[in-house]
């Protein structure tokens, strides 16, 4: 059937289209043009210039797609490659899955370069470079680094995760670099120790274990379990120190608190500044 089709292996079939070749045993090309199956049990349903080159690989359609991993599948689209074991590219264009059991749903120029059980749902130029059980739901130019386990980027752009169990919800250019760190959104925020959290804002840093920044601009929570609610240019640098809001406030001893205001400093242990400007509480429990 069809025109210039070839079935060259046992129980193979090229049943429609033109210039198709079923070269693997028990392989099938149903239609389309210039499609080729080379592995045992390979299937190409249609489309053009598609290749199923490993055992039980499948290409459903589209143009210039390649399923080269054992049990791999490409649903459609253009120039997609599924080369990992049981890997899948559902659609889109120029997507590549090299890792085992990896899945790319669609989008453009997304890559899972190695690792196991990783997913990129869609988006543009997202990359998983070798983690395991990690997910990029969408967005643009997001990256999960190699050796990472079970981390997630939900969306946004230019995010980087390089630690296990880390999460970035969205925003732009956020970095979660330690295990169990979380950035919900915002721009250019960095969560760089275990269990750190940044909810949003711009250029905020949580750099000690269990430190939290709620939002604001250029705030730094660098003490263990320290907290900054918001404001600008505030620093909570010791364990359990708290700055609720304001600008240019400093809580620089354990359990020190600044509730708000401008350029206030709580430098004594258990000290507190309620608000105002240029106030200093330097004594213990002052």
Q: Model regions: which residues?
A:
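Periodic small-residue-enriched repeat registers in elongated scaffold domains
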Residues: 1-286
